[in-house]
Amino acid sequence: MSMTDPIADMLVRIKNAASVGKPNVRFPFSKVKLAIALVLKNEGYIFDAKVIQSDNSKSDIEVVLKYFEGRPVIRILKRVSRSGLRKYCGKAELPEVLGGLGVSIISTSKGIMTDSKARESGVGGEVLCFVA
């Protein structure tokens, strides 16, 4: 069965696993999903993200979730731009999450990065998701 929004599927898997206290979560590999997971790792929302080779020659991404005092570090994980309604922002309109306490993950011409790095680089792009 094909998936209409693989990024939304990845975000929901992470959110659901964190809400029930799982130590890690796996989902099918794609370069975009790996880039998003690495941004989450660099921002300190997860411990690790690595590519795992499955036995049927398809790769998976395994994300090791992070908890603080028994509660998940990721409180908000929301898909913004979706297949039915894309959301693009120029460098001046890039959204801040919770007044700068969270991050927006942006797909730019220079790669997938946070809103603050996109402002530093002077580029806009598609707003993929909000994380806090």
Curated annotation (Swiss-Prot):
One GO term in the molecular function aspect is: structural constituent of ribosome
> Is the keyword Ribonucleoprotein in the record?
yes
GO BP annotations, alphabetical order: translation
Q: The organism sits in which domain of life?
A: Bacteria
- One Gene Ontology term, aspect cellular component: ribosome
Show the Gene3D superfamilies listed in the entry.
Answer: 3.30.1370.30, 3.30.1490.10
Q: What UniProt keywords apply to this chain's record, in alphabetical order?
A: Ribonucleoprotein, Ribosomal protein, RNA-binding, rRNA-binding
Does the record's keyword annotation contain Transferase? no
Give the quaternary structure: Part of the 30S ribosomal subunit. Contacts proteins S5 and S12.
Family per similarity comment: Belongs to the universal ribosomal protein uS8 family.
What function does this protein fulfil? Answer: One of the primary rRNA binding proteins, it binds directly to 16S rRNA central domain where it helps coordinate assembly of the platform of the 30S subunit.
Which protein, by its recorded name, is this?
Small ribosomal subunit protein uS8
What is the native source organism of this protein?
Answer: Xylella fastidiosa (strain Temecula1 / ATCC 700964)
Taxonomic placement: Bacteria, Pseudomonadati, Pseudomonadota, Gammaproteobacteria, Lysobacterales
> Which gene is transcribed and translated to give this protein?
rpsH
